[in-house]
């Protein structure tokens, strides 16, 4: 007889018909809160409604219910993303010059928006070349579409409709997984299964399918486009997929099918999976065959990674075991207890994810220009500047968000009674040492970095250029950075024998790549000017970290307010009768951190914009002479504060200031309007609550006199609300001002 082990019981991991679908309930403002559902007494109600609508912690303390709401909201978010993407593709299909751009990307600018001629507004439609009049776009969509093999506006229509269908599907999924089949808490906490699906499914199969698309569709179509074939003559994507002979004409190894794969003769496939390095001289982008190879390799790694964790089969790693085994000689209990934190506090989990994703986004910003992935991206200076700026801002916001949710975790989810001598506890116990040392580093960096500039301004003002820190007087060369550049420039042949050129032209060693008489990329020299501004970067980043980290480490208690945890994540002051305890909540640290994040990112994008215009971007003559946009003035001008003001801000603002009456005039209006939005923020940041309450009561008196007083009592914004409105307008105004300044400048001169 055969003895079988008993079949493992399958766990039921969903609740059916968990919560009924009720439009009546959703139509009641504030239905998620007993207090808010009563309706407004004062105008504070509308602010609380916005503040608490998505604060699921405040609706219920049931972790399972909170998890389900977050999960469902994610589908709503995905739906909006698909809707947005669909809109972008629809604009490309309906309003753009994509097909014209595809036929001549060096002389025709990308445009996907035409302004209706209402009372002279058609002035905004500039000539982007090829007889098309519209607004020049700088989002990089045209370049992505070309890289993915889209050759007609009909294909864009089809994709737009597909994205709409997916948006509807996501909306349905969000409803279904909350109201019809809601996952149980155990499902959300099953981290090994989640890792397997995310690694092998999303990243592994996602990369594999993209590699497949690139090999079978993008590569052959781009090969034809690069050879100058008319897009209308190129076979359609399905023809390449269904007809192997068609591909074999371009890539001979296709004739052999899968035989080389199974006989391990993989080098046969080197005609479409390459390892070249550097840029394609035709398009100024990375070799698409390198990119396909990269995605195939990434897919293999993640497919393997997705099979490492123990699920139903009792084989593989358990995350709890990994964390608890992670102990160093000086770290006490090490990571013990972190597993429980990360499976019961979604704020802690989100905090880590935001920190990682924020850092990754900033890495993306730096790779988009140094290794431009799409065809004709590198010579589209407006798009290059926009992509760098966009990814820097997004990265900054995500990192501040990481600190915000770390602090919320500390206040709402941290249980000091169960934590002893693990890493988090040890960090909290020596927080004074951490913060005071970090503070010292900030003071040192601030005085020394600004001191170098002040010295240069003083020497310059006194007419003593020989005593300045510059490449031509007292040199402060960034020797470590230059060493790293040099190492990378020499790497091919030494560390990566298959590669013909280094990963990025910026390292040096190579020649410049120019497309259609414009510089795509060249080796970027670093000198004293970069050394100086680099230390400003170090200073602003350290101060941002100081503010955010102090907020997290002192979120629960401090010498000033030992019972801070009881006051919550955001509070104005420690009650009446305790002076000097305002602006100490964890929320206030996020508020202050946002301003320093804004400082830090502003210096970075200014550095990038000027450096690229001065030392990289420009035109090249038939004799091979490069003329940069600002003629290499960065090295000598940016070493004084006066130089930044005069030769960057003022000199380069001339395009936006003089844009009235031209197709760039919208940027001039935005520049003005965004300054107003920014200035408006100061009204909220500089005046106290009592001032406004007094004013309101005077206005209410006037309304009463005229018998037009509303039933809902007007109230001044609370201290926290006023700060939130202030910082929002400060950042919005500042970012929109920078956007208008950058784009008017680069579209005019680039």
Curated annotation (Swiss-Prot):
Compartment annotation: Plastid, Chloroplast thylakoid membrane
Pfam family, one: PsaA_PsaB
HAMAP family: PSI_PsaA
Residues the entry annotates as binding chlorophyll a: 683, 691
Major localization class: plastid
Described purpose of this protein according to its UniProt entry: PsaA and PsaB bind P700, the primary electron donor of photosystem I (PSI), as well as the electron acceptors A0, A1 and FX. PSI is a plastocyanin-ferredoxin oxidoreductase, converting photonic excitation into a charge separation, which transfers an electron from the donor P700 chlorophyll pair to the spectroscopically characterized acceptors A0, A1, FX, FA and FB in turn. Oxidized P700 is reduced on the lumenal side of the thylakoid membrane by plastocyanin.
Binding site for phylloquinone: 692
Record keyword Kinase present: no
GO cellular component entries: chloroplast thylakoid membrane; photosystem I
Binding site for chlorophyll a': 675
Lineage: superkingdom: Eukaryota
Name of the protein: Photosystem I P700 chlorophyll a apoprotein A1
Assembly description: The PsaA/B heterodimer binds the P700 chlorophyll special pair and subsequent electron acceptors. PSI consists of a core antenna complex that captures photons, and an electron transfer chain that converts photonic excitation into a charge separation. The eukaryotic PSI reaction center is composed of at least 11 subunits.
Catalytic activity as recorded in UniProt: reduced [plastocyanin] + hnu + oxidized [2Fe-2S]-[ferredoxin] = oxidized [plastocyanin] + reduced [2Fe-2S]-[ferredoxin]
Keyword hit for Magnesium: yes
Note describing how the cofactor binds: P700 is a chlorophyll a/chlorophyll a' dimer, A0 is one or more chlorophyll a, A1 is one or both phylloquinones and FX is a shared 4Fe-4S iron-sulfur center.
Family, similarity comment: Belongs to the PsaA/PsaB family.
Bilayer-crossing regions: 70-93, 156-179, 195-219, 291-309, 346-369, 385-411, 433-455, 531-549, 589-610, 664-686, 724-744
EC number: 1.97.1.12
GO-annotated biological processes: photosynthesis
Record key words, sorted: 4Fe-4S, Chlorophyll, Chloroplast, Chromophore, Electron transport, Iron, Iron-sulfur, Magnesium, Membrane, Metal-binding, Oxidoreductase, Photosynthesis, Photosystem I, Plastid, Thylakoid, Transmembrane, Transmembrane helix, Transport
Binding site residues for [4Fe-4S] cluster: 573, 582
A GO molecular function held by the record: chlorophyll binding
Membrane topology label: Multi-pass membrane protein
